[in-house]
Amino acid sequence: MGEKKSSSAGKSLAVRKSRHKNCLSEIPPTPDNEAIGIIASLSPPFARRQTIMNNLSHAIDALIAYAREKLGLSSRNAVYARNTVLGLVGAQSYEDSGAVYDGREVSDLLSDLVNACAEAGLPAAEQPERLTDGVMGALMLSPEAVEEAFAAHMRVSSAEATRWLYDYCVHADYVKKKKLDANPRFTAENGLIVTINCAKPEFRDPKKAASGNSVRGGYPACTICRENEGFVGRNKCTLRTVSLELGGEPWFWQFSPYGYFHEHGIAVNQKHIPMHVDRDTFVRLMQFVDLFPHYFIGCNAPLPRIGGSVLAHDHYQGGGEVLPLHRAPIAVPLSHPDFPEIRAGVIDWQGTAVRLSGKNADQIADLSERVRVAWCAYEDAARGLIPVDGDGVHHAVSPTVIKTQNGYEMNLILRSNITSAQYPDGVFHAHPEFHVIKKESIGLIEAQGLFILPGRLVHELADLEALLISGAPLPEQYADYAMLFAEMKAMSPAFTPQSAHEAVKTELASVCSRILKNTAVFEAPSDTAQFLIRKAGFTYGK
């Protein structure tokens, strides 16, 4: 009987050996020395698989804990959210890791998730942006819940409401604040703000830059339609918008993921209609600052080369930063006999801009419309100012508004997109000698003195600094910088690392100022004043 038991035990062990080769999860506990040896030989791959699963579970749990802390995820919805994330990553198993929020930034937590998915061989890791956008969208409040929370904050103050929404979008990783904070930025002595946007692609080809101007159909119709909210195809699962009413019509507000300034966002018409500027535009802009007096708001000129990249859909840009144009003084005071309550003047500015100030919104809208109509019909062939020709309309106004203790301050920037044989990209655009710094359209934000320069400049300007320090000649690859490099070299007989860096910053600010001057449709403020007096009925003021 004893021998039979021994034989049976041997067969049982043999069966266990066979099973162990194919199913690591079925290893039973046993004191048998041979079985222990088998387990020991199999433990490295088993432990590796267990580690991979633990890493993935930990990454998911850390994000759930983060969402509980920062995104308003309730305990009731936590399990549902976790299962949704498991489905998004394609995981087949999960073990509670007990992870808690440790204070790290969401971008780091998402990197952990992508790395864990890659380690586990999950296909979701091959599209990291889509994966992270989908995961964060699943952890966020719904659009309706965000709208309700925003409305609750609005009952306290509009500043609190926009601050809450902006912070929420940062926490959700829709606004890429970590990347934005890494962008080089400085305020120059001439008052201009210069930034290098490393997160934004450069469109040196105007046709490519204008790709957002035409409607190609499909769904959503363009990149800023409200139907993008939650749309996976454009990685908009984390987009959240809030409703506005402007001019008695439905609009909405959303923050820009790659903003150029503090709390940069856009107000978008609910209807997909082309950009345009008329009296109603001025009214809506002032209504916006009535709602959000801590913001400025403006509208790009609705024409290619001097407007934004999405002219097919009516929208405005604004945010919580006072831009250089808003700080600029009046060079030529003006008044208008039909609007005695409105203070007016030509702004002391490199471009061509007019300021109208007062507390009566209707009067400011009326006078703004007079300026717009006068400018859009103005012709001066000697200066190349042609309002309309066979290529279409060329004159437009870019309005921008802030609210002060004196009421509304409407700044009207006069623009022209006319071209010529000498200036095929635009007579009143950055001239060719400056294209190495900025060739893209000079839109609303730059026209107000905040320049967004391409990311390639980080490395190119660092190379120029090194050349200044060493005294080496400009290599052929940087031939386009010849004029600017000569101007930098003329600033000092010799350069230290610090003085070379300052020389580059000084040159950048000078170039940006000259580009703004290129956009000026009149040579001097006095010329602008004469236009307003002759064509729009203004008189000289005090």
Model segments located where?
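Active-site microenvironments that recognize anionic phosphate/pyrophosphate groups
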Residues: 49-267, 271-274, 350, 364-365, ...
